Amino acid sequence: LTPSRSKFLRALNDYRRLCLGQSCPRHRPLAGMELRLCRDLLVRVLGPSRAQAEKLASSCRALYEEADPSAFWQRLDQLDAAMNNYSLILLLEYRGTRILLPGDTNHMGYGGLAPASLQADLFKVGHHGQRDGISAEQIQAIAPRAVVCCASSDRRYNSADPAILQMMADSGARLYFSDCPPGPDGAVPPPHQALTFTVGAGGAMEGTYLSIPD
């Protein structure tokens, strides 16, 4: 059992136990749904589509029902390779500011979405900013003023790919990081305990690194 298989199978089993053990209502957000979480805050579900959700459910059932060990591992590997693009894609709107949160989606996971639906002021790039995280055409459609990349400073798994960061910087977006990898210009964000964004009316938006207490 490889470390990759072990990690993914453990995650699936943990999630399955969580679902089976909860007695509270469970909701399945699908593309097209709108949720008003509070005054002035609207959440639109862009993905996954109903067809994608059903395909994922079918793949999971087939995996757990598979009796042949060889076929089981093959199904597991196929599901692992595809799982990121079943991520929940959310568009938040607050007082004129749009925030796009694509989960772990890479550039292949936006298929079927109208480019106009992706436009956002703040964009959290998917797949930790790996090279396949977003395409030039998608960045053009999103046209973000600011981009957040959640990546470790040691760039494990090739996260915060320099070419992707340069492409987003060239689009005119300001880059922010949850950790401290260098940006395309070589500048390193200050050490910080958190990254916050303050969003106000009329598109007002400011990103701030919260310093580490002495």
Question: Language-model features: where?
Answer:
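A general structural signal for short secondary-structure boundary/capping elements
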Residues: C150-A151, D170-G172
